[in-house]
């Protein structure tokens, strides 16, 4: 049959690239599960009353090449001015060796958060290096493995200060007036929900205020001033006030460590260690504290432990502080952090080493000195005598200066009264300084860079002697041996080989949606048109960004059934927080601010109660019935009991039990009946897109995990994006921004992230995904995700009971395998199965969530039938091994499961096990072998012997 031109053009080609099983394989799996077609299967599983009649109209699919060309044209509308705005964002030079071998490498960006340390030793080592950089530069004892951005780190510092404060009746938090305005904005938002009073004043007046539990200082100040805070910090400490300092990595290369001056907490952005500005993100924040406060710190902490053979191994330490365990009692709701960006900063420090970093920092400071000297020589006044990279220059005719800057395609900081701010960076050259002279002084200034350089080199006093660092930094060998590109390339490859990512095998983590992150989706994030924009540049310079964000927002509105979308939250947890704040402020606008009860099902993800607590709500747990569904009788009873104070319910759909609950609309109606709002967690949106939608179901607000459903990669633990969709009545209450006032951001609410659009530079990934899939492709992706999960469940149910199912024994896009009966019979646990899967070349499914003693499997639509069969065969082979233990062939204390995973060195060591080496490392015909580099970790040892900095280099060899 002759094909039509439309068929030959094949505009939907990407759909077949993204979805794993082809049409023939889909039919084979449909036959296996007893369904005629994808539509028939969907019709059996999804409640009829919430099925959409037609898919949301987001356009037809485009080819990879057409979508890239379209987005390139949009990106071309951005104007790439040279930005000296500063305020925590500077241009960088990302070493090409890191760009190519890490940022553009799926071995790094497709990995998951390192909950399974045996398959994560490479990125754990890179994160440990990041912590070491943080410790060396801050002068403190304990560091985390990144937070979301500097502003949210400030809010976390405030919350932590209150937790550790000995002044239990104090309720005021002091913020120095020269912190970055976006930081103050986020601090105020968080303080409101916690009921703290925020005082903003000159740092010198911090001692004038009473009932202060914590103080936030900035080093270097937002307008450039270097402060010697030693005496102030000493006096504050004498009053038992917890002192936090917002700092800058590059400045700390030259300046005295805040920890040495007595600070309790030091945090800041690691952006200028090689991470592009990206119109606001993503960037990793660093966070450090004194050892005595370590158990009150937020975020992931990487610790050094031992494996079962006594070898040094790394793991995430002290997880009992975190939301997935402590829920509403957690230190923070943080789930995803910024691992990929922290690792860029970490490797930037490794590549340059202490000598290279000092050269960069000194060059930046020298050029700043030259600029300052020339301006002062011509009669201009500097606001601050002591500075590192930022000058606050008083100008008589500010409008003329800004006009000359615009003509030269230069951005200066313009929000300072009668002055402009100028922040130099590692990309600044002597030619740039000469151009700045022209902008500030006119063309006839007559200044000579060489002459000025000689003068300032002999007599620079812009950094106080007391503030010059006098201790060595980055002395560990890892920062002093990989400075040639060959060495660096091999070091990064050695780390990558230790890890298991999507470029090697499926990662069947339930509730995580580890789907394909296509190369075409990733390409635009490194385009300079997107990567090099300052988040506070004039809006007319970011028209391409605004068009792309507007289109993406419009698509998400249609896909969710909501009326508006806010792109600011830069993680799913932040999205939850922002959505709950919208609900809180909505109630307040109706004079019902007393509504603070948040109903949460017992099956909920730990971020839900943690976010509710952060939003100032009280959590009331709703029971689930024996089938895993929300108990409607218990819901009605508790909604009625708390009717006067009911704020909302947080519910996930499909449920965290992997089922489309038939009564979801009734749940919404009950909550609405008693005056509450419905927050529908978007964690499982991958089973909704094109089939149903939160708005159609009856919800009022949701966050979307763009790093799950819409293809932003997990990056080994971040970045993420968590925009919120809202119904019209909540739209006035989404986060706003105090620095950037642009269309779509005109709400009067406080910010939840540092930048107006959060991690804007990764939004092109989701734009590309939706553009290339189109309406039909997106629906098909959801349907195949459901098919794949049901195929796995149907083939494994006889070996491992599927804990919860819906109508006709079906599951949604994931299934929970119940390991508890096997454990009772044999002693083999879900942990043993998870570790044994490593020997078969797989990352484990989600363990013991949402039910202890289970494994939750989510294959996504991107995995083909061959990979699904490989996983199923591995699980069946493991079940046969368990039967060997049950039959007494292998003892409970010595078998391939309890000893898993097995490593290469065991092959040549003495072998005393009752099973062969072949069974250990090449079970059931495994051919394409992934080799873990450590055996099972000793979690108890790691937490009892907490060590969170680089170990001797001999331990890595």
Swiss-Prot record:
Q: Which UniProt keyword terms apply here?
A: Oxidoreductase, Pyridoxal phosphate
Q: Which reaction does it catalyse?
A: N(6)-[(R)-lipoyl]-L-lysyl-[glycine-cleavage complex H protein] + glycine + H(+) = N(6)-[(R)-S(8)-aminomethyldihydrolipoyl]-L-lysyl-[glycine-cleavage complex H protein] + CO2
Identify the cofactor(s). Answer: pyridoxal 5'-phosphate
Q: Which Pfam families match?
A: GcvP2_C, GDC-P
Q: Which GO terms describe its biological process?
A: glycine decarboxylation via glycine cleavage system
- N6-(pyridoxal phosphate)lysine occurs at 708
> Which residues, by range, are in coiled-coil regions?
none
The molecular function terms in GO held by this entry are: glycine binding; glycine dehydrogenase (decarboxylating) activity; pyridoxal phosphate binding
Cited function: The glycine cleavage system catalyzes the degradation of glycine. The P protein binds the alpha-amino group of glycine through its pyridoxal phosphate cofactor; CO(2) is released and the remaining methylamine moiety is then transferred to the lipoamide cofactor of the H protein.
Listed NCBIfam families: gcvP (TIGR00461), PRK04366.1 (NF003346)
Task: Tell me the subunit arrangement.
Answer: The glycine cleavage system is composed of four proteins: P, T, L and H.
Which family does the UniProt entry place this protein in? Belongs to the GcvP family.
Name used for this protein in its record:
Glycine dehydrogenase (decarboxylating)
What organism is this sequence from? Salmonella newport (strain SL254)
